[in-house]
């Protein structure tokens, strides 16, 4: 489903200036107390800004698709119409997930530490909230997988630069002005014709008792009036033809400059079985990790290994497909698999790997050595603080 074209002036203004939200989110990130006392408040503001950005990107994608454009200015593909609605819900959940985790954590911290029953209860509530969020995202992605007939999920956002939207909206406004400027000429011609007819009718009424010569002249005037009317209607017909020709030329030019959007999902891929298995493993990997994390605990290696094995199996099934058919990856699939490879770096800062090899290991000793150099001391302190903060929240390192 493609979103409708905007009509509100406020919405058009926001769409044409949506990139400025990035500056607002950067300011929120560096607010005083962002990772301290004001963490929950600032994360709430950040979530609201993300939701607004997601909505504007959703509407911007609809504008591009409705104008038969499927690429933004940097060459990235816009998700097809059957992606948009479900993908919008996924991005909305992702915008709120960290806020809900912080809210559950802050509620737990307000209780007395000596009350172990309350602590366990609040900890269970936090675990349940994270599980529900991960399961909800998995269900939405599974729905998207069904919509794509088992093809790889290659779209995870629908960001559109505001300059692209502004260009399209300005072109549409200019086209409307061109059509409107054609209409006054036809209207003026018709009004002139009506004035001529009214004047001639008055002359006929004033000369009812004239002689036969005047009567013949009036007949000639009637013939002239009919001829003038025919000329005006002919002029109107020519103007309409010019408008239709101009509109057709603009549509042909627009189609030549863009790619015709496919409104229907593609057929199932030839390597349907292996690719679908790979995508299902990719979709449910976060759920598998979190459930095992809740069962075995933070210090156990089982959740870490189970998640990593699931990730590698997913990559193998999705990347290699059916060897016998020798199916080659598309450009979008290759980019998506490369993106998933980069997400493997999150395993370096997850427990218990981080505590074992980084937090108290070689990297920590190396950073402490660099801190002795005065130039690097401040930068190293900031890096370590951010690393410690990012490890305190599950969704910072979940890569889901």
Swiss-Prot record:
Bias kind Low complexity: ranges: 190-224
List the residue ranges of the region (Disordered).
176-226
Q: Which domain of life is it from?
A: Eukaryota
Question: What GO biological process terms are annotated to this protein in UniProt?
Answer: peroxisome organization
Keyword set, alphabetical order: Cytoplasm, Peroxisome biogenesis
**Signal peptide (residue range):** none
Q: Where does it live in the cell?
A: Cytoplasm
Question: Quick one: a GO cellular component term?
Answer: peroxisome
What does the protein in this record do?
A: Required for peroxisome membrane biogenesis.
User: What family is it from?
Assistant: Belongs to the peroxin-16 family.
What is the name of this protein? Peroxisome biogenesis factor 16
Origin species, per record, is Dictyostelium discoideum (Social amoeba)
